[in-house]
């Protein structure tokens, strides 16, 4: 890497890739069990996604971030947080540990902290390297839009392994006409059905965005309640505690201190030694992907 050039860190939302891979194949009844009969469809898809992202975005460094269990500090704030989510399928359960173990074996840096979500780890890494590195985040979670800044872009997974919808801060500001951090305030009003918190009942994304465009923040809207229509004012007044709580739940925590040197995030070599290990472990689809992307079979 040119010493005058900023490092480029690829941050992978491990859970997003793992779940996406699991559901994409389990829907057709494909679990790809290993020699012990344990499903590997999610694990192999996760690694294939991550390897493809490396080949597309060409980072100099990389880390994978993981959720560590269901309970986080947000559950302490609100009992209903993610309470509406079903338990993972039995075929998925063993693949959580398998995915992280394989990620470590490949040589990727992995982060996971009990009580925190992968979003919070990604956010903290973004803040830690702010101004010192370019960052690309690979995820499927729109919550991460709040992390956009000049050196950060977010690649949302679309169809297949190599199609992404990439957001920069400029694109976000042009489309939403607010700053990325103000995205938190829009979610305070709309809530998040997938995360199980309601926001303000009766206020949808369009109204929420208009309110933040005009008044800047949740507190700005509250200060201007008398200027709002009677219907909107009544809805906000009825759900004021939940509005403020929803903003807390929507905000990504960015103050975890990892204090790792950049070298800890070095990319591993995709070499013949790693290939042989993957063959022995039965990860044939990963091996084919690695051969295709990095010519490791030669």
Task: Walk through the language-model features, giving the residues of each.
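Acidic, divalent-metal-coordinating active-site segment for phosphoryl/phosphodiester hydrolysis
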Residues: 142-143, 206
């Amino acid at each position: 890497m040119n010493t005058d050039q900023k490092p480029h860190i690829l941050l992978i939302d491990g859970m997003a890739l793992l779940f996406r891979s699991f559901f994409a194949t389990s829907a057709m009844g494909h679990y790809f069990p290993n020699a012990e009969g344990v499903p590997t469809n999610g694990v192999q898809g996760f690694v294939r996604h991550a390897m493809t992202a490396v080949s597309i975005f060409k980072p100099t460094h990389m880390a994978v971030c993981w959720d560590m269990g269901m309970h986080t500090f947000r559950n302490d704030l609100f009992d209903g947080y993610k309470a509406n989510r079903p338990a993972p399928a039995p075929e998925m359960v063993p693949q959580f540990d398998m995915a992280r173990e394989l990620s470590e074996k490949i040589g990727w840096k992995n982060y996971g902290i009990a009580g925190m979500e992968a979003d919070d780890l990604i956010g903290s890494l973004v803040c830690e390297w702010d101004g010192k590195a370019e960052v690309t985040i690979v995820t499927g979670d729109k919550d991460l839009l709040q992390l956009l800044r000049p050196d950060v872009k977010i690649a949302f997974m679309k169809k297949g392994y190599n199609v992404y919808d990439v957001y920069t801060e400029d694109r976000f500001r042009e489309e939403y006409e607010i700053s990325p951090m103000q995205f938190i305030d829009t979610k305070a009003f709309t809530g998040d059905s997938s995360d199980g918190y309601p926001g303000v009942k009766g206020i949808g994304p369009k109204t929420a965005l208009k309110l933040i465009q005009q008044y800047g923040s949740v507190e700005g809207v509250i200060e201007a309640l008398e200027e709002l229509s009677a219907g909107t004012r009544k809805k906000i007044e009825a759900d004021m505690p939940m509005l403020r709580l929803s903003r807390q739940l929507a905000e990504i925590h960015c103050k975890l201190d990892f204090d790792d040197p950049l070298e800890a995030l070095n990319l591993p070599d995709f070499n013949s030694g790693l290939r042989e290990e993957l063959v022995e472990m039965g990860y044939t689809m990963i091996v084919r992907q690695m051969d295709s992307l990095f010519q490791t079979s030669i």
